[in-house]
Curated annotation (Swiss-Prot):
It comes from the Eukaryota. Pathway: Aromatic compound metabolism; phenylpropanoid biosynthesis. Changing residue 261 to H: Loss of activity. This is Eugenol synthase 1. Disulfide bonds: none annotated. Catalyzes the synthesis of the phenylpropene eugenol from coniferyl acetate. Phenylpropenes are produced by plants as defense compounds with antimicrobial and antianimal properties, or as floral attractants of pollinators. Eugenol is a characteristic aromatic constituent of spices. Pfam families: NmrA (PF05368). The gene is EGS1. The lineage of its organism: Eukaryota, Viridiplantae, Streptophyta, Embryophyta, Tracheophyta. Optimum pH is 6.5. The record marks 261 as: Required for activity. Inhibited by zinc and copper ions. Repressed by 4-bromo-cinnamyl acetate. Desactivated by the competitive inhibitor EMDF ((7S,8S)-ethyl(7,8-methylene)-dihydroferulate).
Length: 314
């Protein structure tokens, strides 16, 4: 999508968030003029200063400032939204600005997790997925060029969640039988690959799925590999599916949402529950010169310099 050797200009919403910051860094690493839209009162000043030192252009504003968004769109080629779950429907404001500007060559909505058009989840998570589907249908109805990215599980986040490397206990919780397969990828890789596909003509109006064969595993296999890495055996405490389903009904919103996500990923195995369609593409096949960090390599990182645990907003 680069013309005359010029790199595409990329605008990122949610660039200071958990996955968005990796997209900003990936965009800068690949040499793209990179704009980061942020609230005027953002608390992420240190991160924004880092982005600026790396060459990012920081634009402060609110999503309600329609005219400002339109003018900003006219300066860029590609728009990526990495807004968190509570802001999913705010993407309609981004879409309105894209439609008025009329020049955007590619829009990537805030997907990046499960492939929402292929799965069904328990009600608390299904309601969030449905909001993402609404954004997709609006993109298609407006004939906005798009790429939908299904990056599956964020590896650092879920290794921290499942294995609890910061917790010295001798027990590990297993959700369901622990035998459902799932795909997970290192957040830094997700950021870099997403920038690659955002400017790749082969990904235009397609679903790109991050499912390299080296990064498919079960909970039990993950625990076994971790035990070998650190030379320690854990007692596995299984939480049965019925108990998890019951919790999604008993807990208030939004506390029931993470439980429903655990069910979707690690009991239903949603990231591996569907076959590829003709218009899908698996990310690792596009770029033989790149390599996803394998789960084994990521566990080595956790042994020597574990990434800090993170929390998600719902």
């Amino acid at each position: 999508m680069e013309e005359n050797g010029m790199k595409s200009k990329i605008l990122i919403f949610g660039g200071t968030g958990y996955i968005g910051n990796h997209m900003v860094k990936g965009s800068l690493k690949l040499g793209h003029p990179t704009y980061v839209f942020t609230r005027p009162n953002s608390s992420k000043t240190t991160l924004l200063d880092e982005f600026q030192s790396l060459g990012a252009i920081i634009v402060k504003g609110e999503l309600d400032e329609h005219e400002k968004l339109v003018e900003l769109m006219k300066k860029v080629d590609v728009v990526i939204s990495a807004l968190a779950f509570p802001q999913i429907l705010d993407q309609f404001k981004i879409l309105e600005a894209i439609k008025v500007a009329g020049n955007i060559k590619r829009f990537l909505p805030s997907d990046f997790g499960v492939e929402e058009d292929r799965i069904n989840a328990l009600p608390p998570f299904e309601a969030l997925i449905e909001r993402k589907r609404m954004i997709r249908r609006a993109i298609e109805e407006a004939n906005i060029p798009y790429t939908y990215v299904s990056a599956n599980c964020f590896a650092s986040y879920f290794i921290n969640y499942l294995l609890r490397p910061y917790d010295p206990k001798d027990e590990i919780t297993v959700y369901g039988t622990g035998e459902a397969k799932f795909a997970m990828n290192y957040e830094q890789d997700i950021g870099l690959y997403t920038i690659k596909v955002a400017t790749d003509p082969r990904a235009l109006n397609r679903v790109v799925i991050y499912r390299p064969s080296t990064n498919i595993i079960t909970q039990l296999e993950l625990i076994s590999r971790w035990e070998k890495k650190i030379g320690k055996k854990f007692k596995k405490i299984h939480v049965p599916e019925e108990e998890i389903v019951a919790l999604t009904k008993e807990l208030p919103e939004p506390e029931n949402i993470p439980i429903a996500i655990l069910h979707c990923l690690f009991i239903d195995g949603a990231t591996m529950s569907y076959d590829f369609k003709e218009n899908d593409v698996e990310a690792s096949t596009l770029y033989p010169e790149l390599k996803f960090t394998t789960i084994d390599e990521l566990l080595d990182i956790f042994v020597h310099d574990p990434p800090p645990p993170a929390s998600a907003a719902f």
